[in-house]
Structures are given as C-alpha cells and as structure tokens.
Amino acid sequence: MILFPAIDLKNGQCVRLEQGDMDRATVFNLDPAAQAKSFAAQGFEYLHVVDLDGAFAGKPMNAQAVESMLQVVKMPVQLGGGIRDLATIEAWLGKGVSRVIIGTAAVRDPALVKDAAKKFPGRVAVGLDARDGKVAVQGWAESSEVTALEIAQRFEDAGVAAIIFTDIARDGLLKGLNLDATIELAATISTPVIASGGFGSIDDVKALILPRAAKLAGAIVGRALYDGRLDPTEALALMRRAAAA
C-alpha cells in the first residue's frame, strides 16, 4: 500500500481543485520543485503529478515544472495530463518519469494503452475519473457513456500497471475517499487499483489499512496535506506498522 502525495500543475504552480473545476483552484506553492523536495523530505516514496493544463489541451503544458521536479527528487514519479500518444509517453519515460497515466486516451483510443503497456511493461497506468458512475474525459470537462468498470475490464490482459480511480464528486472536498466503490472495482479486476478523490484525514489512512481494503495498491492524497489536516509522519508511520503486522 503506497500513499502518493499529489502535485497538480496549473500555469506552472502547485494547485488543488475542487471537484475538478479549474475555476475553483487554490494555489499552494509557486515552486513545484520545492514542493516535491518537501514531500521527499517528509518520507513519501512515490510522487503523483498531474498536468492540469495538459489534460485540457491534450498535450503537455507544464513540461518545465515537471522536469524541474525530476531533477531534484530521486523518488519515482507518476505523471498524467495531456498524454495522448506514444511519442509523448516515450518522451516522458525517457526524461525520468517512472510511470505515465493515460486518462482520456484510455476511453477514446484504447489501442494506445495496449501498445504502450506492451512496449513499456510496468510503466503505464490508466486514470479513470468517474462522475455519477460514468468516466469523465478531457480534464473532466466532458462525460463519456462508459463506466469505470467497463474501461478497466478492457485492459485486464494488457499489462497495465495500475488503475487510478478518482471520484470527482469528492475530489478536493476532504470528505473522505469513496472506498466502497474503489474496493468494489478492485474486487472485480486483477489490475492493481489506487484510490483517489476526497482524502481528508488520518481516518482515511485507518480505513485503508483495514482488511476489506487489502486489495488496494495505494491512495492519492492532496489537499489534506496542503491544508495540514493530515500529518505525513503520523500517516506514513501508521501505514508502515500495518505493513509490518
């Protein structure tokens, strides 16, 4: 079980959105590299980064900020947002990104996911962001007609490293992860599932280490860290104790 601190990039700055709304963005750090170093110093072992502008534009828009983070931290980085073709995937992996996250293209171009997962084993994840049960695309601005489970099942045998499941309705609101839906998804597929959206406090960490969440591969935490609602030392210690038990 991995706890991923999140850095969302908008105009080169670290921000947090509420329910995926770009007009409801709060800037938390003007220097993404400094934020990445801070998370590394706190003891986190894997960084989750999203290029929000890229998710809307369909191509990388915060490359300089991402590259600055890659230069200052040694921990692995998974990156999503605006990754829609094999050339972009290859470029990011070549620059030091450990794992890319394919979101919109997983819905619109499933062959890309399969080709990328085959070419780069263990380095391709799929991001499924759901609103009212349906997967949203294009930076959450548009809704599709397919469910997260339907998309996840498409890639069962593709060698995808992980499914990152986000409940958009909870994202950035600190009301707690939607563990029921995430655990249900994890129980239905063999691909590792990472929970995202709504992480609010140490109570979410306690819920993640319960036996019913044993199939989950991790969770992404954002605003709770920036707001100081989650003590990283306490959270990581709790997860380490659970792993050793």
Swiss-Prot record:
Gene Ontology molecular-function annotations: 1-(5-phosphoribosyl)-5-[(5-phosphoribosylamino)methylideneamino]imidazole-4-carboxamide isomerase activity
Pathway the protein takes part in: Amino-acid biosynthesis; L-histidine biosynthesis; L-histidine from 5-phospho-alpha-D-ribose 1-diphosphate: step 4/9
Pfam families for this protein: His_biosynth (PF00977)
Alphabetically ordered keywords of this record: Amino-acid biosynthesis, Cytoplasm, Histidine biosynthesis, Isomerase
Annotated compartments: Cytoplasm
Repressor recorded as keyword: no
GO cellular component terms, semicolon-separated: cytoplasm
Catalytic activity: 1-(5-phospho-beta-D-ribosyl)-5-[(5-phospho-beta-D-ribosylamino)methylideneamino]imidazole-4-carboxamide = 5-[(5-phospho-1-deoxy-D-ribulos-1-ylimino)methylamino]-1-(5-phospho-beta-D-ribosyl)imidazole-4-carboxamide
Family: Belongs to the HisA/HisF family.
Protein name: 1-(5-phosphoribosyl)-5-[(5-phosphoribosylamino)methylideneamino] imidazole-4-carboxamide isomerase
Species in which this protein is naturally found: Rhodopseudomonas palustris (strain BisB18)
